[in-house]
């Protein structure tokens, strides 16, 4: 297949693009790293699918810069959705679990708006808290890996491994979007308190109240996705255990 991936140099986009290329698909990488600005999006060749991952994330930043979130996540997405609808190209796009409490932040609002303007044949995947190699340094699991956690909260998070997110996207590329629902939740389906996963990692920090703009619990109902044959493979605790084991091994038997 020929697949356009917007945001292909981002966290999820990079993992997805690498797998698609290895599997022999043609991939058009649409992002600034490859000389394409999302505001100039166009399709001038035969394309089988568009995976729209380009966006500005980060709930806290959106409180300070709401305008850029609306412009990038909504206005530019609207252009992409309309172009693909006119050309009858199916779309898989990145939504967020933030839509369940969208009013709390400009980021959540922008994702809720994205879902509202999407056309039939355009499926939104509501990612929960994605972790893995390449995630932003400010994300909790990155801070755990780097031992830079300063405090924890009692907010509940559904951590989902980036490889499992990629497998969800690939499932729709394989099965197509015909007959599918407009949105699916992509998460492990199991929530864990932030303070508990931090403690599991052996990090001792104070527990504080989380920000009002953040969801208190983003645990996904992934039953619709599971019904299509998808299953998560790696939990947050398992990932932390692997990190701890690797760190210990490197200390007692460093690679030479």
Question: Model-predicted segments: where are they?
Answer:
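NAD(P)H-binding glycine-rich loop region in Rossmannoid oxidoreductase-like domains
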Residues: 42-72
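C-terminal "lid/loop" region of Rossmann-like NAD(P)-dependent oxidoreductases
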Residues: 183-184, 192-222
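Adenosine-cofactor binding site in Rossmann-like domains, unifying the SAM/SAH pocket
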Residues: 27-42
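NAD(P)-dependent short-chain dehydrogenase/reductase
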Residues: 104-108, 112, 116-166, 170, ...
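N-terminal Rossmann NAD(P)H-binding glycine-rich loop of SDR-like oxidoreductase domains
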Residues: 3-23
């Amino acid at each position: 297949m020929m697949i356009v991936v917007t945001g292909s140099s981002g966290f999820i986009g990079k993992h997805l693009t690498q797998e698609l290329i290895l599997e022999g698909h043609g991939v058009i990488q649409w992002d600034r790293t490859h000389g394409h600005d999302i505001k100039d999006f166009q399709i001038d060749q035969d394309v089988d699918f568009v995976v729209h991952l380009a966006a500005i994330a980060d709930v806290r930043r959106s409180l300070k810069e709401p305008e850029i979130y609306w412009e990038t996540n909504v206005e530019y997405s609207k252009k992409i959705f309309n172009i693909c609808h006119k050309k009858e190209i199916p779309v898989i796009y990145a939504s967020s679990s933030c839509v369940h409490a969208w009013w709390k932040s400009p980021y959540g609002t922008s994702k809720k708006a994205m879902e509202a303007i999407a056309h039939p044949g355009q499926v939104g995947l509501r990612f929960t808290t994605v972790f893995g190699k390449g995630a932003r340094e400010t994300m909790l699991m990155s801070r755990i890996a780097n031992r830079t956690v300063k405090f924890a909260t009692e907010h509940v998070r559904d951590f989902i491994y980036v490889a499992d997110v990629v497998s969800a996207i690939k499932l729709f590329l394989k099965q197509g979007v015909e007959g599918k629902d407009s949105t699916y939740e992509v998460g492990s389906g199991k929530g864990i308190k932030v303070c508990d996963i931090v403690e599991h990692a052996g990090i001792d920090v104070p527990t504080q109240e989380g920000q009002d703009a953040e969801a208190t619990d983003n645990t996904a109902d992934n039953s619709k996705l599971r019904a299509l044959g998808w299953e998560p493979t790696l939990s947050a605790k398992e990932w932390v255990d692997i990190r701890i084991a690797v760190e210990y091994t490197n200390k007692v038997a460093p690679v030479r």
